[in-house]
Amino acid sequence: MAALGDIQESPSVPSPVSLSSPGTPGTQHHEPQLHLHGHQHGSPGSSPKVLSQPSDLDLQDVEEVEIGRDTFWPDSEPKPEQAPRSPGSQAPDEGAGGALRSLLRSLPRRARCSAGFGPESSAERPAGQPPGAVPCAQPRGAWRVTLVQQAAAGPEGAPERAAELGVNFGRSRQGSARGAKPHRCEACGKSFKYNSLLLKHQRIHTGEKPYACHECGKRFRGWSGFIQHHRIHTGEKPYECGQCGRAFSHSSHFTQHLRIHNGEKPYKCGECGQAFSQSSNLVRHQRLHTGEKPYACSQCGKAFIWSSVLIEHQRIHTGEKPYECSDCGKAFRGRSHFFRHLRTHTGEKPFACGACGKAFGQSSQLIQHQRVHYRE
């Protein structure tokens, strides 16, 4: 693998960063280095891999990477897998940040450090250990990648990205408590675990949207939102279901889809106990209990619980009937009425009585039939 210093600067790189390791004595010439603790796929006696020279790396929204952690990306949104390429090749738009991401993904997730640091005496080496296999004194997971703002002016877009990357986001495990949120917004008091998340949140108050789509001009506060939007233009769908093969452009949509297969319904109503697979469905359901009707018709003032019902209602005023039967040509305002009509042609009767087994094409017919059993 080529050293990061050998990678040419990408035109899209907005802000130079440097790599450093905490707790390391000052190196000669103050060159920032990242020691990988021998976690490369090599022999125990191989020399430790050191990345040197502060190349201009574009790590996008990366705040911190700790060697040995289960998750390399602290951001809540997972990064899509890159298509495999031949060794030594590099995409034209992939800067040194892409090389670093590939490097980190190649490391074992829970490997323990056993890098050797030059010759040592037999007295310093534990019994039974071969030369070059003396364990590193630094605890596993304590090394980090630190983003440091550089004074030198970068290419176009650098001031925008520098605001997001221009802070030391790295931290060692010993340096902060698990679950701590030390970065607080002065405007609303909300706290965040990482300073980059605070910077992104503050754009809600300032209205700043530094990431602009070159296709349609739409702007975004965060880099991840911009990347997800860009897939609308490219058609990229990196998240594929292993059970049915359906692909999605957003990880959140993929997660919601998986609940169809596993039957998971994590969102439960506190009033009636009904559970839902999506939080939005729970919010809409709770309006049945609260009586809230946030969607009002601008023509007649009638209000509705759901926006879909409002859209269907507005077709009364416009006369629009978008659902047309291909068999008889009859058109309908709503989809539910359209599907109910189709059953008159297909003969489908999906509503069956639990008492006698008689089936009906419409739910209203089933309800009317069940009154016979109630009288009995």
UniProtKB/Swiss-Prot annotation:
**From what superkingdom does this record's organism come?**
Eukaryota
Instruction: Tell me the SMART domains matching this sequence.
Output: ZnF_C2H2
Q: Where are the annotated C2H2-type zinc-finger regions?
A: 183-205, 211-233, 239-261, 267-289, 295-317, 323-345, 351-373
One Gene Ontology term of the biological-process aspect is: regulation of DNA-templated transcription
Is DNA-binding one of the keywords?
yes
Modification Phosphoserine, positions: S86
One Gene Ontology cellular component term attached to this UniProt record is: nucleus
Q: Where is the composition biased (Low complexity)?
A: 10-27
Give GO MF terms, alphabetically.
DNA-binding transcription factor activity, RNA polymerase II-specific; RNA polymerase II cis-regulatory region sequence-specific DNA binding; zinc ion binding
Which subcellular locations apply to this protein?
Answer: Nucleus
Q: Where is the composition biased (Polar residues)?
A: 43-55
Keywords for this protein: DNA-binding, Metal-binding, Nucleus, Phosphoprotein, Repeat, Zinc, Zinc-finger
Q: Where is this region: Disordered?
A: 1-97, 113-135
In terms of Gene3D superfamilies, this protein maps to: Classic Zinc Finger (3.30.160.60)
Q: Which family does it belong to?
A: Belongs to the krueppel C2H2-type zinc-finger protein family.
Quote the protein name from its UniProt record: Zinc finger protein GLI4
